[in-house]
């Protein structure tokens, strides 16, 4: 049985009636495929994995979708990971996955996705707040989230929710399949 997490107390004056009906609950193993599909629908333009494929093509015969799907499977398998679903009327409209490091007390928001038809309605905010609340209950002392430069939504949203930019990282790749390596 999925455990609902009440978030309505954060939305008492929500103008959007859908927001009053949103439920946040822990994902079950049976939710894996819908979470993967939400991810693939959302991450084409904002995924490091899709950047790799755009530049180098398939790697080991695997598409960016294959690699990103594996990341989501890892989120579900992680004993210190949690996946929270946002649902309305039993329809999954988004999710957030987190990883809890009990030694460092740092919780990481690994993936966040809202279905295209529900974006810009506050669902992402609710999911992040639910993730933060869960991290606090699990005695985390710091919440961390990362985004790519090309993710304009993340770059705008995360600071509004209290996250502070600390550093930028540049990803480089070299094609080792090329016989003409320098």
Feature names for model-found ranges:
Residues 114, 120-133, 156-160:
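Conserved acetyl-CoA-binding loop-helix of GNAT-fold acetyltransferases
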């Amino acid at each position: 049985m999925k455990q609902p997490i009440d978030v309505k107390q954060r939305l008492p004056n929500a103008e959007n009636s859908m927001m009053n009906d949103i439920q946040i609950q822990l994902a079950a193993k049976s939710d894996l495929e819908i979470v993967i599909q939400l991810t693939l629908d959302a991450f084409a333009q904002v995924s490091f994995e899709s950047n790799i494929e755009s530049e180098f093509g398939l790697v080991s015969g695997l598409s960016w979708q294959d690699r990103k799907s594996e990341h989501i499977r890892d989120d579900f398998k992680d004993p210190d990971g949690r996946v929270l679903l946002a649902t309305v009327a039993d329809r999954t409209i988004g999710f957030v996955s987190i990883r809890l490091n009990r030694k460092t007390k740092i919780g990481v928001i690994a993936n966040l996705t809202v279905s295209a038809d529900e974006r810009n309605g506050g669902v992402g905010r609710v999911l992040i707040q639910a993730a933060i609340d869960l991290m606090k209950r699990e005695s985390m002392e710091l919440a961390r989230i990362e985004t790519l430069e090309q993710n304009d939504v993340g770059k705008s949203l995360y600071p509004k929710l209290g996250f502070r930019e600390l550093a930028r990282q540049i990803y480089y790749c070299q094609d080792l399949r090329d016989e003409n390596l320098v």
